Each structure stands twice: as C-alpha cells, then as structure tokens.
C-alpha cells in the first residue's frame, strides 16, 4: 500500500510538472505497469509518456510502475471505475496463464477492461551456456537427447517464458527431462546461463544481448514463426517454421470497462501516433529489440486463445517440473 501511495504521489507530481508546460486543458492519464519498474514494459511506458505532449493537447500520459502482477491489477480494478483517467497494462501472462494456472489470484476478467492498444511485440529467444555449443535447433535436439536433465532459467515458475520452454522441449519429446528454474525478474533469468546456473534460458532479446556479445551465451532459437531478420540476432531460427508452438509477448494498454467510446478512441490515436513516430520506432527496434505491433480487439482475443491452448497442452510439464 505504501508503494502504491508513493507511486501515486510521484505520478501526480510528474503530471503537474508536465501540465505546467502544456496548458491547463490537458488531462493526465496515469498508466500503471504491474511489473518491475526496470523491466521492458515500464521502460516503454516511460518513453511513451515522455512523448505524449508532442501528440496531444488534451491528454498527457504519466507512467507509474508498481511491481505486483495480478495483485496490482486486482487493486487497480477495485479502485477504478468507468471514465476514470487511469490505464493499466496486462498481457497473455494474466489473461491466458494466470487465469488457468492460478485463477484464485485474479479478481477480474477481461470484461472488466476495454482495449486501447498494444504497446509492443517482443519475440522471446532461448539462449544457452556458451560452453555447451548449442547454436540452433539441431544442436538443441542433440543436447536434449544426451542430457539426463535440462535446466532452463525463466522469469517466474508459471510465466510466459516457462510455458514457451515447456512447449518447445515438450513438443520435441523431452518434457520429462525439463527442470524450470524460476528467477524473480526476466533480466536475472537471462543472466543465469552466463553464471553457469542453468543450461538454457528464455528471455527478451535485449536482456541477453550483452551476455551474448561478451561470449557468455549462444542464441538457440526465437519463439516466432520465422527467423529473426534484423539486429544482432538476425538469422536466429524461428521455432514456428519447424512446426513447434510459439507466441509473442504483448503488452495491452487497457482502460476500465464502460469508459466512453470517444475517450478510448482518442487514447488509441494518441498511442498510435506515438508508436508511429520514427524516433520511437528506432528506439524500440535498436535499443529495446521490440516491434511496433498495433492490434485490434479481435487480434487480442485470438492471441489469448492461442496462448491458452499452449498452456492447456503443456500445463503438466510446467507445474511438475
């Protein structure tokens, strides 16, 4: 509670300072990120908030990160009503994983929100301890066949990363060898292979880049339909082209259900304009190793259902590892 109060004070202070330079007619919208303040979503949210005065005279985005995942969103839903100037992030982790694996943690459903926009798309990658010389799908198959046990670092025991690892190794026929090793953040999990704590890791590309460049890890594959085409990981194989399951990580920007349609449309336009900015796109691609990925509500629902199908199929591997 203290963290939320302090976060709210900071958000209001930031909004006031921004409004001083933008005119009193602008309304501040607090954007709650329920994950680590140093994480990918929080960083993109801060960037979008800083750019919002350039694209709207009536709305200012104020980034507020409160680590807590489902608990943070529970509080947000309880404290927010239709037309409140509040937004929150959620993704497949909550709507497709927590809803099936730990439903008691969720005091909300998708119907409690109205979709505004998707903030970004992230293609997770699997990395390996460099000493293992695993540099592609064929190398991974050979390693899995010979190893008595395979440890994979992930951000949380039942996270998106955990299910991606389970779906790949499980679909290869080695789910019984999988040992998921959960860490408290995605960045920490990404560094586990370099420290020799695990054989493999699943992470955002940006979180393993430095370790890869320093020779501490190899990149095994990308959880996407095709190979990565740009950046430091260009040429890394996409698991989808081999028929293995995958999904991208998305970050949905949501308002409270019942919020006026014209307000939601204005918010969507603001985010779309920010994400179309050339500087933002360059930063997303080159610094964060993310993609602009505008979505419709139908796209969101299809994404959630795809992830749910993977969770249902590989649930026993994850919870039993």
Which residues does each predicted region cover?
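Short, low-complexity disordered leader/linker segments with a strong preference
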Residues: 1-28, 319-321
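N-terminal (or domain-start) structured segment
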Residues: 23-112, 158-161, 171-202, 207, ...
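Hinge/capping helix and adjacent helix->loop/strand transition within the periplasmic-binding protein
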Residues: 28-29, 49-57, 76-85, 100-188, ...
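Residue-level signal for short, function-critical loop segments
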Residues: 35-37, 156, 223, 259
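Solvent-exposed coil/turn segments that connect beta secondary-structure elements
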Residues: 92-94, 121, 131, 206, ...
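C-terminal lobe and pocket-closing loops
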Residues: 207-276, 281, 302, 306-309
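C-terminal capping/gating helix-and-loop segments adjacent to ligand/active sites or protein-protein/ligand interfaces
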Residues: 274, 278-294, 316-321
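Extracellular/periplasmic bilobal clamshell ligand-binding domains
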Residues: 295-321
């Amino acid at each position: 509670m203290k963290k939320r109060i302090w976060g709210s004070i900071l958000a209001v202070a930031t909004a006031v300072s921004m409004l001083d330079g933008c005119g009193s007619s602008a309304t501040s919208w607090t954007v709650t990120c329920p994950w680590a303040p140093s994480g990918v979503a929080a960083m993109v949210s801060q960037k979008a908030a800083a750019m919002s005065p350039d694209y709207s005279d009536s709305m200012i985005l104020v980034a507020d990160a409160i680590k807590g995942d489902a608990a943070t969103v529970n509080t947000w839903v309880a404290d927010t009503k239709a037309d409140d100037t509040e937004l929150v992030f959620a993704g497949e982790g909550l709507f497709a994983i927590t809803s099936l694996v730990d439903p008691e943690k969720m005091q909300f459903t998708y119907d409690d929100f109205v979709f505004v926009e998707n903030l970004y798309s992230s293609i997770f990658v699997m990395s390996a301890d460099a000493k293992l010389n695993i540099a592609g799908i064929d190398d991974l198959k050979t390693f899995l066949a010979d190893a008595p046990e395979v440890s994979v670092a992930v951000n949380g025991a039942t996270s998106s990363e955990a299910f991606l690892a389970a779906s790949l190794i499980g679909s290869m026929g080695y789910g019984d060898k999988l040992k998921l090793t959960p860490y408290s953040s995605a960045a920490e999990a990404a560094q586990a292979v370099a420290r020799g704590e695990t054989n493999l890791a699943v992470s955002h590309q940006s979180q393993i880049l430095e370790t890869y460049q320093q020779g501490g890890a190899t990149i095994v594959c990308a959880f996407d339909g095709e190979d990565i085409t740009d950046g430091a990981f260009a040429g890394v194989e996409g698991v989808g082209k081999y028929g293995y399951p995958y999904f991208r990580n998305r970050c949905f920007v949501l308002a409270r259900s019942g919020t006026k349609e014209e307000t939601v449309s204005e918010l969507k336009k603001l985010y779309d304009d920010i994400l179309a900015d050339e500087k933002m796109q360059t930063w997303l691609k080159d610094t964060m190793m993310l993609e602009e990925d505008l979505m419709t509500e139908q796209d969101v629902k299809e994404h959630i259902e795809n992830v749910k199908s993977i969770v249902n199929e590989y649930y026993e591997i994850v919870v039993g590892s």
